[in-house]
């Protein structure tokens, strides 16, 4: 999913292109597209003569679909994303972390100091509010001229399907309950009839 796309984005900062394979057709995983995302790592002053490494992604070359997939599915941690894209997200984050650690081992060190992703990542709310501090490592997301929110594009459909699925389960459960309840009542009624007939015969 993640590989080195080569290139250099800034002479004054370490960087290159992060190549990510995105699958467009969920029914045919073999039909996929690959996008190259320019990135750079900068040392920025954070006060008290301290510097903080900043990973800067440039998403300006992505179309809305690509932006939504990468930013929405891979960089957020909402419950919807966790449920739907957790395996993809964890794989992407692990590969990205390994890729950056290997490539910048001398500059950063492979002892966890370059731990870009921990159990959590940027939430959709943080993205909206522009909060980009991530476990002591800053992530800067340069959008492509517009605010494409993955959740606003996908949620209505998924929510509709989810509600429909839940409704169908509830309806099926209710129907099953009613059928079973009616069946039990019918059996109870039949048992009572038989019992009354038996008692009637015994009194004769």
Swiss-Prot record:
Which protein family is named in the record? Answer: To M.pneumoniae MPN_373 C-terminal region.
Membrane topology, as annotated, equals: Single-pass membrane protein
Q: Which residue ranges does UniProt annotate as crossing the membrane? A: 160-180
Gene Ontology, cellular component aspect? plasma membrane
Q: What is its main location?
A: membrane
Q: Write down what this protein is called.
A: Uncharacterized protein MPN_373
Originating organism: Mycoplasma pneumoniae (strain ATCC 29342 / M129 / Subtype 1)
Q: Looking at the record's lineage, which domain of life comes first?
A: Bacteria
**Which of UniProt's keywords are assigned here?**
Cell membrane, Membrane, Transmembrane, Transmembrane helix
**Where does this polypeptide localize?**
Cell membrane
List the induction conditions.
Expressed during cell growth.
């Amino acid at each position: 999913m993640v590989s080195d796309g080569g290139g250099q984005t800034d002479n004054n900062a370490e960087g290159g292109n992060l190549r990510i394979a995105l699958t467009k057709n969920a029914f045919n995983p073999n039909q996929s597209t690959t996008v190259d995302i320019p990135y750079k790592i900068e040392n920025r002053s954070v006060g008290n003569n301290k510097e903080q490494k900043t990973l800067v992604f440039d998403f300006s070359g992505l179309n809305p679909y690509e932006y939504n997939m990468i930013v929405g599915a891979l960089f957020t941690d909402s419950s919807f994303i966790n449920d739907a894209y957790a395996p993809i997200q964890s794989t992407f984050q692990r590969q990205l972390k390994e890729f950056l650690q290997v490539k910048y081992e001398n500059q950063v060190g492979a002892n966890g100091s370059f731990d870009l992703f921990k159990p959590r990542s940027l939430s959709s709310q943080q993205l909206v509010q522009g909060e980009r501090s991530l476990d002591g490592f800053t992530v800067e997301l340069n959008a492509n001229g517009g605010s494409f929110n993955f959740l606003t594009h996908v949620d209505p459909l998924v929510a509709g399907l989810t509600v429909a699925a839940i409704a169908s389960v509830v309806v099926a459960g209710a129907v099953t309950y009613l059928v079973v309840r009616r069946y039990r009542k019918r059996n109870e009624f039949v048992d009572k009839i038989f019992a009354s007939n038996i008692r009637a015969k015994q009194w004769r």
